[in-house]
Amino acid sequence: MSQDLQKEVASRKTFAIISHPDAGKTTITEQLLLFGGVIRSAGTVKGKKSGKFATSDWMEIEKQRGISVTSSVMQFDYNGSRINILDTPGHSDFSEDTYRTLMAVDSAVMVIDAAKGIEAQTLKLFKVCRMRGIPIFTFINKMDRQGKMPLELLAELEEVLGIESYPMNWPIGMGKELAGLYDRYHRVIEQYRSEEDERFLPLGEDGDLKEAHAIQKLLYYDQALEEIMLLDEAGNDFSRERIIAGEQTPVFFGSALTNFGVETFLRTFVDFAPSPSSHESNEGVIEADNPKFSGFIFKIQANMNPAHRDRIAFIRICSGEFERGMNVTLTRTGKSMKLANSTQFMADDRETVNRAVAGDIIGLYDTGNYQIGDTITNGSKKLEFEKLPQFTPELFMRVYAKNVMKQKHFHKGVEQLVQEGAIQLFKTWRTEEYIIGAVGQLQFEVFEHRMRGEYNSEIRMEPIGKKIARWVKEEDADEKLSTARSMLVKDRFDQPLFLFENEFAINWFNDKNPDIELTSLL
């Protein structure tokens, strides 16, 4: 790989933004896009009545509900770095999509609501990041409102998540009393709602302001200095190595809604965030600077442009250089393909991409060739990156087309939405009626909404009373083993499994059939 290409790869910063719903994830994404010069003004998820919606919330149902249910991909340049942001679903029902997205990034930004602290979804996603060793940067949001005390939030972060923290800045006041941020890293105080020439006040070697200022008369100023002194004496030492190893999280305070502390966060993040790193494969570790092009598909999205009914496969480039028109091998099938139609994104806006390098996320127009987890490369034809996680559904519905004359629309919609991986498809053993599985109720609502809006197919869904899926070997697939509490079905790959009513039904099945092994996904 040439030095120029190595430099280009090193400039890539590819990260996901994770949070519990309503922590302000989409708002901070908007502000980052603002600093990247991509948008002129930030939309707001809360501004539904005005008809303004967030740039990253592009799907119709997201605009209606004010939640992210798909992973948007956005790219911009900032301070010499190429930023690739993946805005992940904030709703817990879409954890599968989020987990797959976390396989495609080099770091994560965790957004926490200052009033609520660590919430269930945050904890879940954090654990996945830790499992993968992904560096985590923490942004404690909504400091313009009353919330938990900063020291309490730090203690919660360390106790609940089990990770060292290092506050890069520290709030002076909170809510209506918010006056500024004491920036430990840049050695300045960033004032809240100040004139531009007074926004940053330099600190002296003693930790106080170099020159006298009105902010020093505030009660909260002295309190902040005392807390900073406590952090200096008893807190963790700053360690870039531990940050990169995912063992220490730099913590930033701010307010995404009022755009306070966000640009400082972005500037610091670009300095620290890791460049594209290596990926595990069946042929060993593939380094980002390997000259051979390789990548994997972590997401498939249908109807990003409803007028064209198209489908896009999102690929994370792991090594080498992509050039439009290049020939690659889809290693799952061994098929040679020409990558002529490629695109990059700003939520639903897109432009043709002629060239990209390791760390970039690009979209490939898909006519049905790709599956989530596929590896493509112009190197070894047997290369396969590690498998992406798939989850066992916990809710199941039988699904029918209301209008039998529109079966074609129905089948196409089900097929495409299942290939996206947002919902799983099963079929009854003999009659092959459709059963869809999900990890949460919202997935069914989104599925029904998209079937109607994107495929002109009204559907009827009926619960089947089964909650647990367990796969069996083909030789154990005997319909006679089905009971009122268990049902033999097959998945989209025709693999047999039983759907059980509850744990009691599984135990009963195991007692009656001790030689049959039941297995689950994640």
UniProtKB/Swiss-Prot annotation:
Entry similarity comment: Belongs to the TRAFAC class translation factor GTPase superfamily. Classic translation factor GTPase family. PrfC subfamily.
Role of this protein: Increases the formation of ribosomal termination complexes and stimulates activities of RF-1 and RF-2. It binds guanine nucleotides and has strong preference for UGA stop codons. It may interact directly with the ribosome. The stimulation of RF-1 and RF-2 is significantly reduced by GTP and GDP, but not by GMP.
Identification of the protein by name: Peptide chain release factor 3
HAMAP family (alphabetical): Rel_fac_3 (MF_00072)
Binding of GTP, residues: 19-26, 87-91, 141-144
Gene Ontology MF annotations: GTP binding; GTPase activity; translation release factor activity, codon nonspecific; translation release factor activity, codon specific
CDD domains documented for this protein: RF3, RF3_II, RF3_III
Keyword NAD: no
Gene behind this protein: prfC
Signal peptide, first to last residue: none
Keywords: Cytoplasm, GTP-binding, Nucleotide-binding, Protein biosynthesis
Span of domain tr-type G: 10-277
Annotated source species: Listeria monocytogenes serotype 4b (strain CLIP80459)
Residue stretches in coiled coil: none
Compartments, as annotated in UniProt: Cytoplasm
GO CC entries: cytosol
Major place of residence: cytoplasm
Gene Ontology BP terms: regulation of translational termination
